[in-house]
């Protein structure tokens, strides 16, 4: 990937030459594929895991990117393909989230929504709102595939969602 020269110049100024060079190499390199395993069905996934994601209880980096669309475990919700950085929100949740209610305002395609649903358990509730009608179906499909039954999918603006009880 060719980074814009102005960006490279700016980060060299802000970070120094050595650190900027390291960042450019990282941005230019191939990013590892990561997944998050379902809390119940995760053992059904037959994936070549290279290492766990340190900040995610059920997250893992894969040795190589498989053809997910050909994997029945993927279609059965045994795991969710999700960038490791998106799984960091797990660290931001309180230690005891069992039974909490969470509002996810920009929920599609559903990665963080299913993460929240796994953490709050059956006693909790996640309201997954997506303002873009074109993206709601993908969200609903991913929530259905995850199958925990503690997520309500809505389509509205933040003001409408804020009035929900």
Q: Where do the PLM segments sit?
A:
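S-adenosylmethionine
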Residues: 1-165
């Amino acid at each position: 990937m060719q980074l814009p020269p102005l960006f490279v110049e700016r980060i060299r100024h802000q970070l120094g030459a050595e650190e900027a060079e390291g960042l450019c190499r990282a941005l230019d390199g191939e990013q590892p594929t990561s997944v998050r395993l379902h809390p119940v069905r995760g053992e059904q996934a037959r994936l070549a895991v290279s290492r766990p994601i340190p900040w995610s209880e059920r997250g893992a980096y894969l040795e190589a990117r498989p053809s997910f669309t050909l994997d029945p475990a993927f279609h059965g919700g045994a795991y969710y393909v999700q960038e490791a950085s998106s799984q960091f929100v797990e660290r931001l949740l309180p230690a005891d989230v069992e039974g909490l209610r969470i509002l996810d305002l920009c929920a599609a395609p559903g990665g963080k929504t299913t993460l929240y649903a796994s953490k709050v358990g059956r006693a909790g509730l996640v309201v997954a709102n997506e303002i873009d009608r074109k993206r709601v179906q993908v969200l609903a499909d991913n929530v259905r595939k995850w199958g925990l039954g503690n997520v309500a999918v809505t389509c509205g603006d933040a003001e409408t969602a804020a009035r929900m009880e």
